[in-house]
Amino acid sequence: MTATMDNNKLHYKFLFLLSTVYLAIDLNVQGFLSLMPFIREEFQITRAQAGLYFTCYFLIATIIAIFSGRIADTIGSKKGTVFGIIAVGALFILHSFAPYFFLILILAFLTGLAFSIITPSLNKAVMDKVTRKNRATSMGIIQMGGSVGGFLGASLLPLLAENFGWRMGIVISGFLAIGVGLLISRFYREENSNRGQRNDAGYTRLTFSDSFKILIQNRQLLIVCGLGLALGTSIGAIPAHYTMYVTQDLNTSRTIAGFSLGILQIGGMVGRPGWGWISDKFLHGSRIRGLILVGGSLALVTLLFSIFITRYNPSLLLIYIASFILGIIAMGWMGLFFTTVAELVSPTLTGIGTGFALVFTRTGAVISPPVFGYIADVYGSYSYSWMAMSLVVFILTLVFIVTSGQLTSRTPGKQPYDHESS
């Protein structure tokens, strides 16, 4: 592959190969979350305690996100990706041996540590090899693998759990992740590119502290990251609680709840390349207008879950349709968001810039699951949990609209760093 890909086409082999990484990650993570009704039953835990799993998973990944991004910039995308995915697979296999729930939380903490390097590594791979014309779409295609994995995990692992126990299901998914790591090691060819470095040569010699100072002085990046905090609540609370919400508030079986989570992931599979495609093709490359559309849509759909879906005993068909729409919005924004972030930093700071943004999105993901579950425990229903999320997203989207004026005033399609070859 050339250092810079052709503007006029998407290179699907490259994109689909890297998408298998997110497929394996979400097959394990979302699949494990779909097993929460089984795990709650075995360990006799509350909804708030169940929500702590996702918090522990993202906690260490949030704390060290910037350092992980720096590592990705240093060792390259291939080594970071291979190490991360194999370690995640091995740790999920260890989940199956845990006799107590607190040990599962410790393993979630360690799994998040291994996962922390994967997103910066994959984002760096895309920014190094894909030109701006199709970058948001390409990032979405890679992220789409996560939705495929999430659907497979949420649909298949509960079936395995019903027949063989939840521990056997997580062993199988863990070995699959290790297999993907070996696949990436064999077939992904990383190229060292000097693209963008002639205009950015000074950045290649920066220390970690100097790089961090540049990021926190980037007001445009901070504005986008502020919205990322709100969007992060959706990827934390919703998948962590969705099967419990569908079983308890909507009175369905655990298998139907797992399938609903799978449909949520299918929606995310459509949304991840979809939002990027809308930005690339219909918004003339305007990432900011795309993010405003995502934030407004998320506030609206979570409000509808609060005042309509939860309270009026929807049919099974409506549950599936609502799950799909929620997935498009709540689980589909990542490709567009991280493309925006990467285009706001120097090409040589893509990894650490991604890590910086992950601090914000993962903070939302860490805080939201226990809060979402606590509100449901207090009121005996998830209705007020959905309402709280809608309010938070609405307020931070309004703040983003007000403060992002200087970004939208730029020449359409231009960002501080275009990551293009000279």
In which residue ranges do the predicted regions lie?
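Cytoplasmic membrane-interface "Motif A"-like loop-to-helix N-cap segments
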Residues: 74-84, 281-296
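Residue-level signature of mid-helix packing/kink "hotspots" within the transmembrane helices
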Residues: 30, 58-66, 150-151, 265-269, ...
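Conserved MFS/SLC helix-loop-helix module at the cytosolic interface between two early adjacent transmembrane helices
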Residues: 63-99
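C-terminal transmembrane helical hairpin of 12-TM major facilitator-type secondary transporters
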Residues: 285-337
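Helix-loop-helix hairpin linking two adjacent transmembrane segments in secondary transporters
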Residues: 142-190
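Cytoplasmic helix-loop-helix junction between adjacent transmembrane helices
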Residues: 107-148
